[in-house]
């Protein structure tokens, strides 16, 4: 059971509970048993699952709830809160600051994906405006420097290593000195891994750490080991002063939930998760938005950040103005498709859209979804400027549709499908009319200005129902931090699959 399946199973359990005519002990018990079964299949420790059930039952005491209380909403909120508690170590990790030199050392067992993760970490920060660099102090594994060199070259990140020197401490110090002179503000040191935890590995890590004095030591762990992650994370934390954890290989293994919860139990913060082999299949891990996306409710503040990353700053005010007007043209859709294809794995992006993850992209078929978007763009390439800029749906007559289909080499059905998708998105866009725009014109600040009425209009009816209507949304806002809308949006996941 991969994480998407885990989220689907929990969402279905909540949906079945919401659809019940009467919420009684039997319905609550069935819902909690389904959720517990899904968590156990994801290799979450039995004790953690049992404690979660106990805590939810303490919150949701059906006998003592006042008449007229929305039981569905209370159960959903309790499940959301307990899932967050299960994955939250309650301790923040060191965060590099742009322009201020930081040294980060990576440690982990061989085969965990440590070297690849070093490059992903560097690439992520490079896109955020940092000047990262990579140092290969792994002299144990044959080919380690070649791998780092290849990855770094592809990502256009400066690197340092040696084919001749066998002392990892000397290489680490030389690399550190070189990149400090070059004003790198994030120096990442990759260290040797072993097939198992052993004294020699920990001693080497200690020596490299002593010589380089890293601001943060990151432990890279294979997520497929499930709850065994607890012992591994604990051992590294005690021996290597680990300040944060990155969990890899969460894209196709059954035990990801177990690994995440086990690491949280050691009070070690998970800061990123690896969801594939490609350099952009790497996500920042923030508990509330993660649980929100897991349950199909999206992460709008995260989506705004992604849009800001790929959209030039001078285009953002123009897009926000169009959003405030509620005007959505085919040209605007085309531009957003272009941005969407730059944002990284399409499944990751769609999981941030509340209730819309399956509309454009069939579940688990990212390539099909990407191909569909490119097909739609090809169709729009055969449209006139008047057609692209029009907001009048009656403009698309049968003769125009036939002409567009011929010009793009597509079937008439493909053109009508694209137009239906456009109408659906335009309808959703129009509901945001009148939105107060951020004064600085930044997309990332937009989520703070969304009010309850606009959110209620924009959310699909079935998703809003899962949340308990407007009242549920308001209660959740309060739970997620009150006035800060971005925090609330980052973690409002309580519904549909």
From Swiss-Prot:
> Would you say which domain of life the source belongs to?
Eukaryota
Does the entry feature the keyword RNA-binding, yes or no?
yes
User: Which Gene3D superfamilies does this UniProt record tie to the protein?
Assistant: P-loop containing nucleotide triphosphate hydrolases, Signal recognition particle SRP54, nucleotide-binding domain, Signal recognition particle, SRP54 subunit, M-domain
* Pfam families for this protein: SRP54, SRP54_N, SRP_SPB
Catalytic reaction equation(s): GTP + H2O = GDP + phosphate + H(+)
G-domain: annotated segments: 1-295
The EC designation for this entry is 3.6.5.4
InterPro entries linked: AAA+_ATPase (IPR003593), P-loop_NTPase (IPR027417), Signal_recog_part_SRP54_M_sf (IPR036891), Signal_recog_particl_SRP54_hlx (IPR013822), Signal_recog_particle_SRP54_M (IPR004125), SRP/SRP_N (IPR036225), SRP54 (IPR022941), SRP54_euk (IPR006325)
Keyword line: Cytoplasm, Endoplasmic reticulum, GTP-binding, Hydrolase, Nucleotide-binding, Ribonucleoprotein, RNA-binding, Signal recognition particle
Region labeled M-domain — which residues? 296-497
**One Gene Ontology CC term in the entry:** signal recognition particle, endoplasmic reticulum targeting
Q: How does it assemble?
A: Component of a signal recognition particle (SRP) complex that consists of a 7SL RNA molecule of 300 nucleotides and six protein subunits: SRP72, SRP68, SRP54, SRP19, SRP14 and SRP9.
Task: Report the function annotation for this chain.
Answer: Component of the signal recognition particle (SRP) complex, a ribonucleoprotein complex that mediates the cotranslational targeting of secretory and membrane proteins to the endoplasmic reticulum (ER). As part of the SRP complex, associates with the SRP receptor (SR) component SRPRA to target secretory proteins to the endoplasmic reticulum membrane. Binds to the signal sequence of presecretory proteins when they emerge from the ribosomes. Displays basal GTPase activity, and stimulates reciprocal GTPase activation of the SR subunit SRPRA.
Family affiliation: Belongs to the GTP-binding SRP family. SRP54 subfamily.
Report what the protein is called.
Signal recognition particle subunit SRP54 2
Origin organism lineage: Eukaryota, Viridiplantae, Streptophyta, Embryophyta, Tracheophyta
